[in-house]
A protein has these predicted regions:
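Gly/Ser/Thr/Ala-enriched C-terminal appendages of enzymes
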Residues: 2-181
Length: 181
């Protein structure tokens, strides 16, 4: 990556299992797993447990919000239960799953939902965007929302993924119940 920024020539980039993770730390936390199962017309949360924290799934139906500071920069993504109400008009308490003992809150922030229904009953609900529209959307996010520190290739700043207190408690309860079985 620093080769590119220094003007080096690259003929191609490869993608593969051994190429996206280090052999000594083969963890990629963006794998799709079952998070809920429909039982009697309702969705029951499911969780996959692993010795590697990044591989433990986030159970149940959920909503995900991108949280913005006063300047419009994304400060974190917030996972909540699907029907959970989020109010940012006052300081909003959240849980950092990596440091759950800390008492933290978003203040003077706004949020927008990241998950949108695109298909229902086999029918597409939204118009397909052109390649140019998608490129413009991503460019706008990179230019205006995502911190430069998160975009650098070497030692990037981590984008935070936080949880609502209720969602975090549900996840911890499921993990506790698995440990006691």
């Amino acid at each position: 990556t620093s080769i590119l920024s220094q003007g080096g020539c690259i003929d191609s980039f490869g993608v593969g299992e051994r190429m996206i993770t280090a052999k000594t730390d083969p963890v990629f936390g963006a794998v799709y797993k079952i998070c809920a199962v429909e039982e009697n017309g309702k969705f029951a949360p499911r969780i996959k447990v692993s010795e590697t924290v990044e591989k433990i799934t986030n159970p149940g139906l959920k909503s995900v919000y991108r949280v913005y500071d006063e300047e419009g920069h994304a400060v974190a993504d917030l996972i909540t239960g699907f029907d959970e109400k989020v109010d940012f008009s006052t300081p909003y308490r959240y849980v950092d799953p990596e440091k759950p003992w800390k008492n933290r809150s978003y203040e003077n922030c706004t949020a927008k939902p990241l998950l949108h229904k695109v298909i229902e009953g086999g029918k597409r609900l939204t118009k397909t965007k052109t390649l140019q529209e998608l490129q413009a959307y991503v460019k706008k996010q990179l230019d205006n929302e995502i911190w430069e520190e998160e975009q650098r290739f070497e030692n990037p700043h981590k984008h935070y993924i936080d949880m609502s207190p209720d969602y975090y408690e549900m996840k911890m309860s499921m993990l506790h119940n698995i440990r006691t079985v």
